[in-house]
Structures are given as structure tokens and as C-alpha cells.
């Protein structure tokens, strides 16, 4: 049998020691492809098609090597030749196919499907430039294209195409296939569609382009700017390309396996991930009609085949489109949607549940709930809120459709790959079983009282912090003290996630330190977030944090105790560096607004403690670890919902009534900030906080300051107690494996392979 060194040298055509990193990377890509192809297995019974606008898959080389059982052999072979696998990984571009939690969840789910030997493929779009590449200049976010495609991409071009009609014009969707390896499991596929006519050269001045040149622009960017009509129309064009090509792929694959279309639900389960793929429902009905199936039967077939995952409590994220837009882009779907609307209106007199409302807007989530057999939330609290308030009318109409599937993460990437030193310590105590069965992490619990074990785990964290400090200096040009407490808030920039609450805390700390009240331990507060290009206030929050970072760094009294770092272009690669190094994980969304969150799970798994509200999956983390092992603060979801219902919240009352809060908000336009930042941005954010504050930052401010202070004190004054809490969090993280989530989806909704 060939050694790994011999295998790689044969692929490259020369000795490893003489090979470049690029040559080794391409050889490993070929090796992974051949090994993963051997794990493709025939489909018996029902197969899942997971349709999602985004898949934030991250770099694939190391993940695939781990899943295929090749990682150690490859690492050792390279080391023997004086090469580093981490250097080879740098050659790989990160795929620009997703942005936030929605896309990362989809990627984790694909990993778990393959690991559990379940037949399940993804369907999405092959974006050329992703959301955008973020850079900072003059304290402001700039957006640039984020290219990743090249001739050596993991996504392989096929000869398979499907015709798609957009605004009455014919287009041809090209299929690309990306292999998804499971850990000691099967290989599934992520199917990505694109147009051969896309022209990357039309992008100029950052991420500007002609939004009307559909043949050239359709898959350039994920979530193109929708601040104008052309941008909103472009999103519909994108969504229809994805679902029309995807529906044709599904029907073709099922037909090849013997499906006669009447029995489609026996061959396919389709999961609609949020509302972006909703048009797959009328498109499938339309296509089945072309196969000669009557409308009512087609509706039943599609309803039995499709299921819908709701990911939000924010009304703004429940997509609705003006009927006039759909009339223009997908006129072939409108007769179907009108019939579905009429059928829905026969089921209920509640006009709030209509698909087409009185203002001629088409509600995608309403269509999903009426014409799928399952609607699930993604955390226990989220599902409860959907049932009791946000979607209560639908719950009364279809109680049997509603269910909860608490989100999860793949431990292969978020532990095995990104924290190998921690894995080594865990295995030395409980063996390797947790790699396949995350619940086995609970075997760590007895070691929570073992000071020697706690010290070893603490040393892993210290080494990870040093590694992050080195990475920050190398990639961001920022020096940080690795012995300080690392406090991290990394997630999409949105007011409901409340980076602005963290901002106000940091300003408060600035004043406290200047007054001589130094914290229990130096604090490095690290942010990673992109703001949507048209989301002005979110970009103002970024500007305020970058400006505050300058002000603090220039103050000799404050700088030794407090540092603010904003990581540029936060992505999966950055997350893999930051998460293992985190001490305190910021999960501070306004209670009732975060559906689940999965960053909270990743930080917990890697031994960080959570500072958070009782929102999303924080509730279930608290239940798992116990209130004494998490730092909870702020209003409850019930209090928040009541405050919205009564409509009595006036931020000015809190601003006037709390001198510390007023001081922090006033500082935004104080001389120190104005000397380092831009008045327009800072004043606009200040005005927003004083007069609107839609996500109730001010009422939670004092509770946040107190609880965060307690966390800092515990970290500094009771290191043994802190370490014990960290180990308990790791041991209780098994519930949040996406393997558990996918097993629940399969047993309750999909019934794959049956």
C-alpha cells in the first residue's frame, strides 16, 4: 500500500520537498475528490433536497480531510517534508456562498446529513462575489467584490443545464456540483446553479453594477442591494432561477429512480430554508401541470413533499413582494399563486393569513405555511413565540404542522478542525467516541472538580489566545495582550443583535477607567460583523466602534485596561481563529428577536462562557448548563413583547433618567469622538438611540453593565471557578450538535430512505 507521501508525490509528479504550496493544494484537492467519489452511495427511498439562498461552507480542505480520515496522515507526510498543512490551507480561497447564521446552518446540516448516512443534497446558487469583501477606511465600511472562483474550485462544472424563463425571456441554468463529505459517512452533493453569460467585468466602484442586465449580473452577488426597485426585482430573478432549476433537477432525478410524479412525495422531501426558496411551491405545481397532473392533485403532491423552516421573528425578514414585481419577473407563476391564494381564503376568513393581501402584496411565508406539511421554528422559545403571537392565526388553523427543531452545529468543523488541542485533551479523558456521538461529551462532567484537568484546559485556552493574538497582528495589524480577557461579539451587524449595547458599555468603561475605577482584568473587546450595504444605522455602529477604538488607543490612562478590535471581513476562516480563543461570548440580542443563534453554541463548545439575554437558544443553553454557569441579564421575552404591545417605550425617558447612560450617549458626539470620527455618522446614531431605539438597548443597559462586571470579576478573582464553568459548558454542548437536529428533522418530517 502506498504511503501518503508516495500518493501525493505521484499526484504532483515530483518530491514533496520540491513542491510549492499551490501544487500540494491541487494534489490534495484531487485526492479528496477521488476518495469522496468512492463514498457516493445509491439512494433508496426518499431523498432530501435542502433549498437555501446561502451556504456558508467555509474552506473545505481540512474539513474534508478530517471527514475522510486523511487529516493526520496528510499532516504528518507534509511535516516530514518540511511543509505545513496550515500553510497549504492558506492557498485555498474561502467560498463566497453565504453570509450569516442562515448559510452556516445550511452548511452544518449538509455535513450532518452525510455523516448520518442520510441521502440529502443542497440546492443553491453559485455566487461569484458573495455578499462583499469588507474593508475599513477612515473608520467606515467599504464594500468590494469577494472573488473566489477559479479553474480549481471545489464546485465542478457539469454538462447538465435547465431552461428557465425570466420576464418572458429564455435563460439556461448551468449545474455545478460540490461534493459534501460526511465524517465516516457518505458523500452527498451541493448543487449550485449559474448562468454561463455572467460578466464579472460589469462590476465597478466597489460593488456597483447594472442591476437590469440580468444575463450578466444574476449570480454576481448574494443579496444584492435592495434599496431600489431594480435591486428588489433582481432578488426575485435570483430566487426564481434557483427554484426553477432546482425543481427541474428534483423531478429529473426522481424520474430516473422510477417516480411517476404522482408519487413524488415518496421519492423527495424538500426543505424550504427561510422564505427565499418559497417559489419552489408554485413552480413545482406548474411543472407537474405540464406533466399532465391536475391542479388539486399537484397541490396535494407538493404539500406532502415540501416543509418550511421559519428563521425569524422580525417582520421585515418575512418576505413579501408587490404583485406587480412577480407579474413582470415570473408571469408564468402568477396564475398558480392566485389559485393558491383562493384556496387558502376558502380555508379561513382571517384576511391576515392571505397569500395575496389587500395591498396586492404576495406573502411568501404565508404560502409556505398553507402549502407545506410542516412549519418549524429553530429554538424552543422561537417556536413558542411563533405559535403564541407572530404566527398565532396559522397555528390555530394548522396546529399539527407546527414543531420545533432547535438548531445545531457540526462538531467536525467547530471542534475537531478549529480546536485540535482541546480535542486532544478531551480524548485523553473520555476517548474518541464524542467525534461521532456528541452526547459523550457529558462524560467530562466528573472532571469539573479536578484542578489538574482544569489547568490543562485553561492552558489550551491560553495557547489559543496567543494564536489569535498572532493572527490579529498578522492579518489586522493590531497587537493585543493575550493575558487579557477576550470578549467577543461576532455576528451579522443588526440593531436587534445589539452591538450598540456593547458600544455603550465600552464607553461607560472608558469613563470608569478615567475616573480611577479600573476593571478586575484588562479587557480586549473583539467584534466581527458585516453591515448590509444599504443599512445606514448598522454602518454607523461600525463607525462608532472603530472611532472609539482610536480614542481608547490614544488614551494612556485607558489603553492598558481596555482595547476595541474590529476584525475586517469576518468570515468562517476568522471565526475558526476567534472562537477557540474566546473567554466571554456576547449573545445579547433583544429577548424575543433572535430565532436561535448558533454562534452561542460554537463558543460554548470551545469553552467560552455566555453573556446573554434569555433569547433564542440561549434559553436552552441555560437549561443545559444551569444558571450558575451562564451570565444572563435583561428583560424577558414576555416583558419585551408586552412593551411592544402597549407601545409605552420612550427612550428619552431612560436617557434623561440615567446619568451613566446619558453620559455614554452624549459621548458619541463629544470632542474626543468628533476629533477621530465623522459627525454625520455619530450624530445619526446618537439621535437613533435617543429617539427610537427600536430594539430597547437603553432598558437593558444597567443590567448588562452589572452582569458583565460580574463576569470580569469572576474571571479575575476566581480562576478555578471560571475554569469549572468552562468545562461544564463543554460537557453540556452535545445537545447542540447538528447531528441531533438532523436526526429530529428526519424522524419527524423527512423520513429519508423510507
Q: Whereabouts are the PLM-identified features?
A:
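A conserved ligand/cofactor-binding region detector
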Residues: 1-754
Amino acid at each position: 500500500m502506498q504511503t501518503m507521501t508516495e500518493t501525493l508525490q505521484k499526484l504532483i509528479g515530483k518530491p514533496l520537498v520540491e513542491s510549492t504550496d499551490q501544487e500540494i493544494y491541487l494534489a490534495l484537492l484531487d485526492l479528496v475528490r477521488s476518495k469522496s467519489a468512492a463514498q457516493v452511495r445509491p439512494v433508496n427511498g426518499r431523498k432530501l433536497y435542502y433549498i437555501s439562498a446561502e451556504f456558508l461552507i467555509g474552506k473545505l480542505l481540512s474539513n474534508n480531510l478530517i471527514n475522510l480520515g486523511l487529516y493526520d496522515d496528510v499532516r504528518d507526510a507534509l511535516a516530514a517534508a518540511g511543509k505545513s498543512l496550515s500553510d497549504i490551507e492558506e492557498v485555498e480561497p474561502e467560498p463566497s456562498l453565504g453570509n450569516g447564521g442562515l448559510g452556516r446552518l445550511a452548511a452544518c446540516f449538509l455535513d450532518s446529513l452525510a455523516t448520518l448516512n442520510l441521502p440529502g443534497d443542497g440546492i443553491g446558487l453559485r455566487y461569484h462575489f458573495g455578499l462583499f469583501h469588507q474593508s475599513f477606511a477612515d473608520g467606515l465600511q467599504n464594500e468590494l467584490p469577494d472573488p473566489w472562483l477559479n479553474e480549481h474550485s471545489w464546485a465542478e462544472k457539469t454538462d447538465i443545464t435547465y431552461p428557465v424563463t425570466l420576464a418572458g425571456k429564455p435563460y439556461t441554468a448551468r449545474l455545478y456540483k460540490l461534493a459534501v463529505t460526511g465524517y465516516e459517512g457518505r458523500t452527498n452533493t451541493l448543487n449550485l446553479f449559474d448562468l454561463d453569460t455572467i460578466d464579472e467585468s460589469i462590476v465597478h466602484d466597489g460593488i456597483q453594477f447594472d442591476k437590469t442586465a440580468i444575463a450578466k449580473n444574476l449570480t454576481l452577488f448574494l443579496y444584492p442591494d435592495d434599496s431600489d426597485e431594480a435591486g428588489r426585482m433582481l432578488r426575485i430573478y435570483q430566487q426564481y432561477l434557483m427554484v426553477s432549476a432546482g425543481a427541474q433537477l428534483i423531478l429529473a432525478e426522481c424520474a430516473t429512480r422510477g417516480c411517476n410524479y404522482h408519487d413524488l412525495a415518496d421519492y423527495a422531501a424538500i426543505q424550504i430554508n427561510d422564505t427565499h426558496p418559497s417559489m419552489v411551491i408554485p413552480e413545482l405545481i406548474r411543472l407537474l401541470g405540464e406533466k399532465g397532473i391536475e391542479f388539486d392533485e399537484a397541490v396535494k403532491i407538493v404539500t406532502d413533499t415540501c416543509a418550511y423552516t421559519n428563521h425569524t421573528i422580525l417582520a421585515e425578514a418575512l418576505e413579501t413582494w408587490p404583485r406587480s414585481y412577480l407579474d413582470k419577473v415570473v408571469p408564468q407563476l402568477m396564475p398558480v399563486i392566485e389559485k393558491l391564494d383562493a384556496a387558502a381564503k376558502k380555508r379561513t376568513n382571517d384576511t391576515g393569513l392571505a397569500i395575496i393581501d389587500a395591498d396586492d402584496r404576495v406573502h411568501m411565508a404565508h404560502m409556505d405555511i398553507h402549502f407545506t406539511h410542516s412549519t418549524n421554528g429553530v429554538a424552543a422559545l422561537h417556536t413558542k413565540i411563533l405559535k403564541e403571537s407572530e404566527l398565532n392565526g396559522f397555528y390555530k388553523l394548522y396546529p399539527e404542522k407546527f414543531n420545533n427543531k432547535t438548531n445545531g452545529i457540526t462538531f467536525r468543523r467547530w471542534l475537531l478542525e478549529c480546536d485540535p488541542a482541546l480535542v486532544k485533551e478531551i480524548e485523553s479523558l473520555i476517548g474518541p467516541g464524542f467525534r461521532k456521538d456528541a452526547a459523550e461529551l457529558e462524560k467530562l462532567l466528573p472532571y469539573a472538580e479536578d484542578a489538574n484537568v482544569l489547568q490543562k484546559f485553561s492552558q489550551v485556552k491560553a495557547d489559543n489566545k496567543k494564536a489569535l493574538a498572532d493572527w490579529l497582528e498578522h492579518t489586522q495589524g493590531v497587537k493585543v495582550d493575550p493575558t487579557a480577557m477576550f470578549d467577543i461579539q461576532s455576528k451579522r451587524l443588526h440593531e436587534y443583535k445589539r452591538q450598540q449595547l456593547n458600544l455603550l458599555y465600552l464607553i461607560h468603561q472608558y469613563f470608569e477607567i478615567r475616573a480611577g475605577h479600573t476593571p478586575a482584568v484588562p479587557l480586549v473587546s473583539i467584534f466581527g460583523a458585516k453591515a448590509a450595504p444599504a443599512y445606514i444605522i448598522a454602518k454607523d455602529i461600525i463607525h462608532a466602534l472603530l472611532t472609539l477604538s482610536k480614542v481608547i488607543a490614544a488614551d494612556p490612562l485607558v489603553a492598558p485596561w481596555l482595547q476595541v478590535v474590529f476584525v475586517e471581513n469576518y468570515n468562517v476562516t476568522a471565526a475558526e481563529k476567534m472562537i477557540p480563543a474566546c473567554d466571554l461570548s456576547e449573545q445579547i440580542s433583544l429577548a424575543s428577536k433572535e430565532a436561535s443563534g448558533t454562534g452561542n453554541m460554537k463558543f460554548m463548545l470551545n469553552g467560552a462562557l455566555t453573556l446573554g439575554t434569555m433569547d433564542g437558544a440561549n434559553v436552552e443553553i441555560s437549561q443545559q448548563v444551569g444558571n450558575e454557569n451562564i451570565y444572563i441579564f435583561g428583560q424577558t421575552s414576555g416583558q419585551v413583547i408586552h412593551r411592544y404591545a402597549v407601545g409605552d417605550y420612550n427612550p428619552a425617558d431612560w436617557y434623561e433618567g440615567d446619568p451613566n447612560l446619558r453620559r455614554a450617549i452624549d459621548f458619541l458626539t463629544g470632542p474626543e469622538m468628533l476629533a477621530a470620527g465623522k459627525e454625520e455618522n455619530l450624530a445619526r446614531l446618537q439621535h437613533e438611540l435617543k429617539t427610537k431605539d427600536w430594539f430597547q438597548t437603553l432598558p437593558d443597559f444597567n443590567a448588562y453593565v452589572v452582569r458583565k462586571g460580574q463576569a470580569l470579576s469572576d474571571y479575575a478573582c476566581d480562576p478555578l471557578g471560571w475554569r469549572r464553568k468552562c468545562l461544564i459548558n463543554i460537557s453540556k454542548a452535545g445537545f447542540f450538535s447538528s447531528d441531533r437536529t438532523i436526526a429530529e428533522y428526519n424522524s419527524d418530517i423527512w423520513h429519508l430512505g423510507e
